[in-house]
Amino acid sequence: MQYPEPIAKLIDSFMKLPGIGYKTATRLAFFTLDMEKDDVTEFAKALISAQRDLSFCSICGNITEDDPCDICQDPSRDQKAVLVVEDSKDVMSMEQMKEYHGLYHVLHGVLSPMDGKGPEDINIAALLTRLQKNEAIKEVIIATNATPEGEATAMYISRLVKPSGIKVTRLAHGLSVGSDIEYADQMTLYKAVEGRTEM
């Protein structure tokens, strides 16, 4: 049976989200149709507002309403350390821990030759430029996920940064192989930051 075009379009739209297959997208589409009109309107407004009002910080690449972001503008942050993460969700996870007080740099991905992602496809050049311009930075803490792509990205960044004399460290692996930072509990993250090792 074919669904009416508006439902089919809604299903297709939900399937564009990561991890959402046809069955889940269909369930979400019908759930949306059962929602109150006001709730659907608020949901649509929230999507449009997020797309319109958010951008990436020109310094660290984190998602923000203001440029530069609040973290980059905060003079109380430790200006000597930059924690390099894969995406903005990782920044949120680290901030919830409330134990790391340095700066961040968001890569927006990892090196993945299988997916055609090279160094030019992620935010590495901006990191190198930032390190050259800001002599206050003394340590780069690499916090990419414990996946083969995350490890390859960490090694690549380490090779580029080390010749500059800046200390390069890697989060300790209380994080199990294949795990994502955004899903780690706060104690695990705290121990990973505290136990970081030099690369």
Swiss-Prot record:
Pfam families: RecR_C, RecR_HhH, RecR_ZnF, Toprim_4. A zinc finger (C4-type) spans 57-72. Keywords: DNA damage, DNA recombination, DNA repair, Metal-binding, Zinc, Zinc-finger. Signal peptide: none annotated. GO terms for molecular function: DNA binding; zinc ion binding. CDD domains: TOPRIM_recR. SUPFAM superfamilies: Recombination protein RecR. GO terms for biological process: DNA recombination; DNA repair. Residues 80-176 form the Toprim domain. SMART domains: TOPRIM (SM00493). The keyword Translocase does not apply. InterPro entries: DNA_Rcmb_RecR, Rcmb_RecR, Rcmb_RecR_Znf, TOPRIM_dom, TOPRIM_RecR. NCBIfam families: recR (TIGR00615). May play a role in DNA repair. It seems to be involved in an RecBC-independent recombinational process of DNA repair. It may act with RecF and RecO. Belongs to the RecR family. This is Recombination protein RecR. The gene is recR.
